[in-house]
């Protein structure tokens, strides 16, 4: 088979969720499949993190913007290479594509009501682009992959797609997320002392940052320990608005926001955290849940969308819209050592059920089925 994989953004320096997913899929396929020929389409960038091998060819193609790259430059390159299929990995694909198309549709949040006020121009453009493109390509796809049973049911219902055209393939997590001794004290690049709560909030309303910060304020009022809260990045003006609106000035001297955390440092951040807060209103999967659990760090997560499916039935679940529920579980971890140790073990065991190798194996099986029935 001659397989094309769209991985447009994996060479950029500051990668995000979908970039890491396709990067790990490509790396695992490189390890396991020496028979088929792959063409991985990327945009030029500062971090050439994948190299050519005998049967894997990295195709760098330029373009002034993502829509132009995907709708014009990519189809032209695909046509010239005479591929058997093209796997587009980040929710959208070329509207005009001459080869069998596989689409990974991580979620359909772009079809749901949203608050555009906190979004950048680029984020708003992406939202409109997905709303325009996805309905036009969805019926052309041979298979639509998504990352959880929750999201698969959501997609089937809202886009009227029969189950036989869907494939659910779980994400994995990187093998360097594991219990580690931070002998170099890497965490000190971001926060002075270990034993903090870690939270990946941002301005996206679905990340539930405001309610989580309200919960943290109430935690500080009730806790004798008063642990710091480490957040990766948050706009200062956005934070100030939350503090003023909710009268939670007490969080200001206890919250640490160092900016972007390098991915290679994240295992040390999780290992030195007391617990990880993943209190989103909605997630299609939630790789950070697995990363934290694989490091042996207890997680407090939401009882909504895919999070119970990923975290497993024995994890700590809260109502993300109830700050008091979040606080109660933060305090329970802090005050009940036996419960804390149990959650460490539960997380380690649950994380073992996921891997990028499994993800790649399922992908290869899907490619073979599409090729057979092309």
Language model region names:
Residues 1-374:
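Carbohydrate transferase catalytic cores enriched for Leloir-type hexosyltransferases
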């Amino acid at each position: 088979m001659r397989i094309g994989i769209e991985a447009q953004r994996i060479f950029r320096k500051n990668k995000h969720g979908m970039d890491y997913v396709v990067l790990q899929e490509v790396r695992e396929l490189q390890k396991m499949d020496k028979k088929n020929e792959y063409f991985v389409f990327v945009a030029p960038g500062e971090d050439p993190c994948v190299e050519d091998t005998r049967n894997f060819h990295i195709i760098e193609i330029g373009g002034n913007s993502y829509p132009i790259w995907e709708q014009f430059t990519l189809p032209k390159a695909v046509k010239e290479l005479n591929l058997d299929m093209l796997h587009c990995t980040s929710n959208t694909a070329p509207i005009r594509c001459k080869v069998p198309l596989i689409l990974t549709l991580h979620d359909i949040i772009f079809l749901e009501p949203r608050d555009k006020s906190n979004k950048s121009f680029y984020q708003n453009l992406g939202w409109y682009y997905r709303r325009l493109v996805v309905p036009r390509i969805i019926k052309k796809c041979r298979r639509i992959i998504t990352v959880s049973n929750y999201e698969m049911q959501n997609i089937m219902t809202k886009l009227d797609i029969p189950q036989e055209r869907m494939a659910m393939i779980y994400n994995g997590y990187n093998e360097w997320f594991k219990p580690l001794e931070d002998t170099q004290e890497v965490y000190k690049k971001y926060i002075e002392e270990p034993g903090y709560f870690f939270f990946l909030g941002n301005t996206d309303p679905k990340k539930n940052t405001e309610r989580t910060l309200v919960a943290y304020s109430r935690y500080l009022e009730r806790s004798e320990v008063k642990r710091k809260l480490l957040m990766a990045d948050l706009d200062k003006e956005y934070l100030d608005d939350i503090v003023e609106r909710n009268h939670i000035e007490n969080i200001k001297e206890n919250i640490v926001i160092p900016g972007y955390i390098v991915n290679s440092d994240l295992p040390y951040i999780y290992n030195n955290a007391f617990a990880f807060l993943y209190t989103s209103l909605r997630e299609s999967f939630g790789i950070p849940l697995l990363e934290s659990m694989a490091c042996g760090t207890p997680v407090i997560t939401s009882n909504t969308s895919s999070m119970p499916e990923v975290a497993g039935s024995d994890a700590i679940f809260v109502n993300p819209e109830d700050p008091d529920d979040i606080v109660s579980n933060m305090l329970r971890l802090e005050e009940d050592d036996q419960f804390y140790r149990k959650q460490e073990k539960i997380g380690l065991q649950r994380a073992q059920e996921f891997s990028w190798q499994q993800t790649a194996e399922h992908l290869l099986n899907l490619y073979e089925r599409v090729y057979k029935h092309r």
